[in-house]
A protein has these predicted regions:
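Formylglycine-dependent sulfatase
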Residues: 1-172
C-alpha cells in the first residue's frame, strides 16, 4: 500500500523509468512496473552471475543485454531521457548500478588501468587481502564514474541539465 517516489512522479505526469538492479521483488506488485515505473530494464534478482551480455528483463520480458551491463543500463536510461525530452515530457529516471560487486568483471579498458598497479590501500588483515579483487573493484568504480559522466554530458547536450536534479549515491 506504500506510495513510491515513482508513483508520485507518474501521478504528476512524469515519464518514469528504472534501469539496473531492482532488489525489491520480481513479482507484481513489487516489480518496478508495479511500483510506478512505466519503463523497466534490468534485473530483479538479488545477485547476477555474469555482467557481459546478460539475460535481463524489459517490462516483464526476458531480453539479452548488450555488452557490459552498467554501460547498457546507462545507454537505456539515456535513450529514455532523450525520448522524454523529445516528447516535451518531464522525466524521473532511476539508475541503480550493481557494481562494484562480485562477480568482479569489468571491461578491459577499465581493467587495464589497474592491472598490476601498486595499491596504497591495504586490508588490516593481510590474510584477507585480495589485491586482484581490489583492483577489479577500483576498475568498476572507474566505469561507474565514466557512465555517470556520460549521463551528465547527455543532459547538457539535450539542454536539460540546468532543469534536472541529479542525485548520486551508492551502497557498495
Amino acid at each position: 500500500d506504500e506510495v513510491t517516489i515513482a508513483d508520485t512522479f507518474k501521478a504528476a505526469g512524469y515519464a518514469t523509468g528504472a534501469f539496473g538492479k531492482w532488489h525489491n521483488g520480481m513479482q507484481y506488485p513489487y516489480h518496478p512496473n508495479g511500483r510506478g515505473f512505466e519503463e523497466y530494464y534490468g534485473f530483479t534478482s538479488g545477485h547476477w552471475g555474469h555482467y557481459f551480455d546478460p539475460v535481463l528483463e524489459h517490462n516483464g520480458a526476458l531480453v539479452r543485454g548488450s555488452g557490459f551491463c552498467v554501460d547498457d543500463f546507462t545507454n537505456k536510461a539515456m535513450e529514455f531521457i532523450e525520448d522524454s525530452v523529445k516528447q516535451d515530457k518531464p522525466f524521473f529516471a532511476y539508475l541503480p548500478y550493481n557494481t562494484p560487486h562480485s562477480p568482479m568483471q569489468v571491461p578491459d579498458r577499465f581493467w587495464k588501468k589497474f592491472d598490476g598497479a601498486e595499491l596504497g590501500m591495504r586490508n588490516r588483515d593481510p590474510k584477507k587481502e585480495n589485491v586482484q579483487h581490489t583492483r577489479a573493484a577500483l576498475a568498476m568504480c572507474e566505469n561507474v564514474d565514466w557512465n555517470v559522466g556520460r549521463l551528465l554530458k547527455k543532459l547538457r547536450k539535450l539542454g536539460v541539465a540546468d532543469n534536472t536534479i541529479v542525485v548520486f549515491f551508492h551502497d557498495n
